[in-house]
Amino acid sequence: MTTPNKGNKALKVKREPGENGTSLTDEELVTMSVRELNQHLRGLSKEEIVQLKQRRRTLKNRGYAASCRVKRVTQKEELEKQKAELQQEVEKLASENASMKLELDALRSKYEALQTFARTVARSPVAPARGPLAAGLGPLVPGKVAATSVITIVKSKTDARS
């Protein structure tokens, strides 16, 4: 029975004496079914059977460990990718939130200005209408004048920003 070179990480071909002088490579030992292995083990000594089964178990465990490492690395990469995407989304939402807060503050200021204006218009007496259109207008109602003036102010401030 020969043993593989321990210095090399790659699996070396290991030959085991088998039935009718046949030998098994590590790959064959790992890939064969239990039934095939048992057929191959017939006629070998108890010690050889134990060594061969131990070798098979060691090789299979090595394979499982390798696939586990690959799976762990893949999962880690996927989680890091998801983390980056979520961080980008958080930054985007924080930016939108800040923008909406600014917009809300601007709207509050406009609202307060409109309320102040409406109060001043409601307190001040309305001057009678003059000019050529005055006859067709009739008496001016303070609420309507104030609403028209307020709308004009809002539109002119909005247009000035654009």
From Swiss-Prot:
Q: Which SMART domains match?
A: BRLZ
Region Disordered, as annotated, extends over: 1-24
Note the coiled coil stretches, chain numbering: none
Residue ranges, annotated region (Leucine-zipper):
79-93
Report the superkingdom from the record.
Eukaryota
What does the record say about tissue specificity?
Highly expressed in skeletal muscle. Also expressed in heart and brain.
SUPFAM superfamilies assigned:
A DNA-binding domain in eukaryotic transcription factors, Leucine zipper domain
Q: Phosphoserine occurs at which residues?
A: S124
InterPro entries (UniProt xref): bZIP (IPR004827), bZIP_Maf (IPR004826), bZIP_sf (IPR046347), TF_DNA-bd_sf (IPR008917), Transcription_factor_Maf_fam (IPR024874)
| Keyword set, alphabetical order | Acetylation, DNA-binding, Isopeptide bond, Nucleus, Phosphoprotein, Repressor, Transcription, Transcription regulation, Ubl conjugation
Question: Could you tell me which residues belong to the region Basic motif?
Answer: 53-76
User: Outcome of K53A?
Assistant: Abolishes acetylation. Has no effect on binding to NFE2 but impairs the DNA binding and transcriptional activities of NFE2
Give the subcellular location. Answer: Nucleus
Q: What is its main location?
A: nucleus
Instruction: List the GO cellular component terms.
Output: nucleoplasm; nucleus; RNA polymerase II transcription regulator complex
Extract the signal peptide range.
Answer: none
The UniProt entry, under PANTHER family, shows: TRANSCRIPTION FACTOR MAF, TRANSCRIPTION FACTOR MAFG
**Record-given protein name:** Transcription factor MafG
